[in-house]
């Protein structure tokens, strides 16, 4: 027989059903279902002749059984064998091929596991135990967690274990890296961040400033879910009872949480929104973050809440880090309670209305157009204020657009965008250094040829409309430009300009005849308009250029 047996050849073609040791007749029936083998028992030579005949007929019909034809089509070697000897020899052949196939399978499986272990970073390159059954010779029974070794105990890139795997205890220095970095404001009071809460989108700050007469301190009151939450200005403590009422918590759970607080101050007398258990700022912020009501209570948890009341804008992170060093020293000791007059100075942009009631004078101020009653009850009145109209020049809103034009734009664009600066800078004069620098920068940026801009920096004659708004004198001193104005806007043609320069006779100074000009530029005829000193200088330079051309 040949070196390839029938089941191994079928396995090479992907047919795994014939891998078990079988008799020759059964193998022939499964390999060739078209040909029916005789199942009658007879002598071996008769079966071999029939098998050879059917194999020859099948070889004509099916082109892929050449191995089977070569194996069964040699009757000279097999004529002396009985059926039992042939079956035993074939079983030995199959057993040999089956063992060699398993011998080849397991190194491939372990190399596959090592390949996955090498591709995953920070994994230990240990051999992975492969749970392959010997009967399954295909790769469909691969374990589901093959890319992740089950016995990996390595480094910070820990992956969550699969359901079938056992979680490995992580060393303590690694477990600290796994936890998300907590917000520092909830941990220590002297943290570097002084913001505490950023402005959520679409929400304007609504704060009412009241005076707590019994405690001689100022209070900041924010309403949410028809509950007024108050924060003291002297030690930044917050009414925890009202805070948890905003979260619509039950009374038993609320009291249980507040009783477990170590630092608390119980207030039993006073107005409705002042009664309750007062807790520190950090604990209140942690509770609000846990109950997800921080955005509803904006700007109660902004650390520098006075700036929010004055400007109406949360201080940004840059200003917060700059002010952190200044406030870190004062954060250790609580500031003294400010006098009632200080309320008017701190809330500069807000309207302060005093009203007499049972508690005495209560100062209530609303910021950002809110209309919320003050601490005294029904007797106090508040006045809505538009903070944008009330801001002074010292606040960031007053000179916002002015600084935007001065600082945000680069200096090279300032001569075209900021009209208030053109009278002071010599940028509008022809041949100045800023024009040359601007054109050089444009040539460096876009890789233009320098000779393409010849004369452009000198007299700006090729692009009159580009310089018209700040330099109207060119349009009047060179009247021949206006005839081809539309063509020059679309495509500056140097040949047309050279032809016009030959035909036209420019008279130096301002043009003596009227010119059809664009609506952006007033017509400058001689004696009609008193030109500015810049126009005088430009006219003189234009006349010198005209003389040089002559």
From Swiss-Prot:
Sorted UniProt keywords: Cell adhesion, DNA-binding, Nucleus, Phosphoprotein, Transcription, Transcription regulation, Virulence
Alphabetized InterPro entries for the sequence: EFG1/Phd1/StuA (IPR029790), HTH_APSES_sf (IPR036887), KilA/APSES_HTH (IPR018004), Tscrpt_reg_HTH_APSES-type (IPR003163)
PTM annotation: Thr-208 is a phosphorylation target to promote hyphal induction by a subset of environmental cues. Phosphorylation at Thr-181 by the CDc28/HGC1 complex represses cell separation genes and leads to hyphal chain formation.
Residue ranges of every copy of the HTH APSES-type domain listed in the record: 206-312
Induction: Expression is specific for the white growth phase. Down-regulation under hyphal induction depends on the presence of EFG1 itself which plays a role of autoinhibitor and the protein kinase A isoforms TPK1 and TPK2.
Principal location: nucleus
SUPFAM superfamilies for the chain: DNA-binding domain of Mlu1-box binding protein MBP1
Impact reported for residue 208 to E: Impairs chlamydospore formation but causes hyperfilamentation
Subcellular location: Nucleus
Polar residues biased stretches: 123-153, 384-394, 420-435, 514-544
Gene3D superfamilies attached to this UniProt entry: Transcription regulator HTH, APSES-type DNA-binding domain
Phosphoprotein found in the keyword field: yes
DNA-binding region: 240-261
GO cellular component: chromatin; nucleus
Region (Disordered): 17-48, 72-95, 123-182, 329-435, 476-550
Molecular-function annotations in GO: DNA binding; DNA-binding transcription activator activity; DNA-binding transcription factor activity; sequence-specific DNA binding
Name of this protein: Enhanced filamentous growth protein 1
Organism: Candida albicans (strain SC5314 / ATCC MYA-2876) (Yeast)
Gene name of the record: EFG1
């Amino acid at each position: 027989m040949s070196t390839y047996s029938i089941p191994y050849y079928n396995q090479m073609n992907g047919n795994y059903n014939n891998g078990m040791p079988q008799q020759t007749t059964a193998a022939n029936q499964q390999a060739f279902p078209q040909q029916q083998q005789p199942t009658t028992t007879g002598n071996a030579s008769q079966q071999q002749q029939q098998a050879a005949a059917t194999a020859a007929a099948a070889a004509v019909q099916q082109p892929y059984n050449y191995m089977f034809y070569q194996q069964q089509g040699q009757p000279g070697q097999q004529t002396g064998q009985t059926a039992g000897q042939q079956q035993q020899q074939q079983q030995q052949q199959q057993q040999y091929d089956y063992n060699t196939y398993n011998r080849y399978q397991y190194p491939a499986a372990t190399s596959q596991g090592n390949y996955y272990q090498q591709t995953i970073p920070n994994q230990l390159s240990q051999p992975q135990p492969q749970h392959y059954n010997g009967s399954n010779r295909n790769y469909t029974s691969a374990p589901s967690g093959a890319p992740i070794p089950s016995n990996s105990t390595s480094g910070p890139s820990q992956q969550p274990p699969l359901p079938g795997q056992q979680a490995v205890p992580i060393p303590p220095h690694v477990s600290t890296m796994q936890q998300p970095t907590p917000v520092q404001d909830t941990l220590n009071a002297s943290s570097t961040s002084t913001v505490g809460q950023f402005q959520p989108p679409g929400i304007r700050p609504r704060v009412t400033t009241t005076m707590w007469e019994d405690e001689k301190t100022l209070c900041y009151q924010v309403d949410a879910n028809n509950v007024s939450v108050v924060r003291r200005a002297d030690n930044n403590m917050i009414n925890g009872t009202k805070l948890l009422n905003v979260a619509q918590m039950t009374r038993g759970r609320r009291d249980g949480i507040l009783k477990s607080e170590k630092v608390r101050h119980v207030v039993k007398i006073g107005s409705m929104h002042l009664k309750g258990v007062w807790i520190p700022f950090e604990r209140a912020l942690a509770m609000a973050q846990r109950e997800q009501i921080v955005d509803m209570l904006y700007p109660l948890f902004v650390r520098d809440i006075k700036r929010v009341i004055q400007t109406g804008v949360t201080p940004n992170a840059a200003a917060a880090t700059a002010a952190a060093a200044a406030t870190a020293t004062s954060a250790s000791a609580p500031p003294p309670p400010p006098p009632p007059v200080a309320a008017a100075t701190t809330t500069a942009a807000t309207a302060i209305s005093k009203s007499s009631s049972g508690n005495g004078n209560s100062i209530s101020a609303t910021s950002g157009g809110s209309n919320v009653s003050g601490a005294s009850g029904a007797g106090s009145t508040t006045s809505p204020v538009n903070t944008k109209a009330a801001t002074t020049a010292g606040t960031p809103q007053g000179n916002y657009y002015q600084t935007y034009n001065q600082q945000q734009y680069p200096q090279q664009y300032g001569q075209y965008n900021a009209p208030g600066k053109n009278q002071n800078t010599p940028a509008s004069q022809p041949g100045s250094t800023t024009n040359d620098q601007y054109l050089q920068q444009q040539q460096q940026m876009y890789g233009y040829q320098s000779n393409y801009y010849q004369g452009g920096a000198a007299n700006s004659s090729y692009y009159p409309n580009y310089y018209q708004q700040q330099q109207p004198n060119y349009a009047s001193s060179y009247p021949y430009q206006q005839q081809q104005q539309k063509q020059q806007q679309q495509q500056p043609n140097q040949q047309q300009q050279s032809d016009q320069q030959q035909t036209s006779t420019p008279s130096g100074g301002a043009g003596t005849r009227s010119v059809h000009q664009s609506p952006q530029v007033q017509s400058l005829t001689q004696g009609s308009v008193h030109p500015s000193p810049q126009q005088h200088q430009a006219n003189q330079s234009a006349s010198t250029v005209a003389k040089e051309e002559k």
